[in-house]
Design a protein with these regions (language model features):
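Perimembrane helix-loop-helix junctions
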Residues: 36-69, 140, 184, 188-192
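Membrane-lumen/periplasm interface segments of specific transmembrane helices
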Residues: 61-104, 162
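Short hydrophobic alpha-helices at membrane interfaces in multi-pass membrane enzymes
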Residues: 3-25, 54-66, 145-157, 197-200
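Hydrophobic/aromatic-rich transmembrane helices and adjacent perimembrane loops
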Residues: 35-36, 167-198
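Membrane-interface alpha helices of multi-pass inner-membrane proteins
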Residues: 15-33, 37-42, 70, 156-166
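Hydrophobic, aromatic-rich transmembrane alpha-helices
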Residues: 120-147, 158, 183-187
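Transmembrane-embedded, aromatic-rich helix segments that form part
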Residues: 31-47, 128, 175-179
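Signature aromatic-anchored transmembrane alpha helix within multi-pass, membrane-resident enzymes
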Residues: 66, 192-211
Length: 211
């Protein structure tokens, strides 16, 4: 995620070239939520492409394509050197996780209680962060194509992806690390407010008692 953020902010070739390798290794180590995060970032990348010039978009997508092909080539090479059939790899890393995911999605009911109330401590910070940035669209000219708005989309979609992953896996809760992260982002947004001391104190108390 950080590599992607740096790529959007600085638009350096090295970040776009490294991104497929980073996500490739992430996918190999843990298919989900890596796949969910990848989908979220692709949405932001496509949204960002609407505001880039043609030359910039060609450069970004060319680097991503070349890097992805190199990673796939190296992966196939490693599999062949170790005598691992490609079909076995596809079955183990792609088809099998998909079958598990489909069965869990089909048998699990996502409703208001599961999605919001179960993780209400995260939403206490996520909802204000969402509203602050949506209001900025109306208050700040062209904010919807500003880097800060792209950053908001990355954070928001990533949080939603992690919550969705947590609901499906039903493993030990690990996403509560998002609380101090979201608290810090709200803190940054409120540093120029008149009653910032009160707001910061409230954020600190909520963060302290929720974690």
């Amino acid at each position: 995620i950080f590599i992607f953020i740096f790529g959007l902010k600085e638009n350096k070739n090295i970040y776009w070239f490294l991104l497929p390798f980073i996500f490739g290794f992430a996918f190999l180590s843990k298919q989900v939520p890596a796949a969910y995060i990848l989908i979220s970032l692709l949405i932001v990348l496509l949204y960002n492409s609407f505001f880039n010039d043609k030359k910039t978009n060609i450069k970004i997508f060319s680097l991503l394509l070349i890097s992805s092909l190199i990673f796939i080539f190296l992966l196939i090479l490693v599999l062949n050197l170790n005598g691992i059939p490609i079909n076995s790899f596809v079955q183990q890393y792609i088809l099998y996780p998909l079958s598990i995911g489909q069965s869990r999605v089909g048998s699990y009911e996502i409703n208001l209680e599961n999605f919001f109330l179960k993780y209400k401590l995260i939403h206490i910070f996520l909802i204000p962060y969402f509203l602050i940035n949506i209001l900025k669209i109306f208050r700040i000219k062209n904010y919807y194509k500003n880097f800060n708005f792209f950053l908001f989309l990355i954070i928001f979609l990533s949080v939603i992806s992690l919550i969705f992953h947590q609901l499906l896996t039903k493993n030990q809760n690990f996403i509560f690390f998002l609380i101090p992260l979201l608290a810090a982002l709200i803190h940054i947004e409120t540093t120029k407010k008149k009653k910032k001391i009160v707001i910061i104190s409230l954020i600190f108390l909520l963060c302290f008692f929720s974690t």
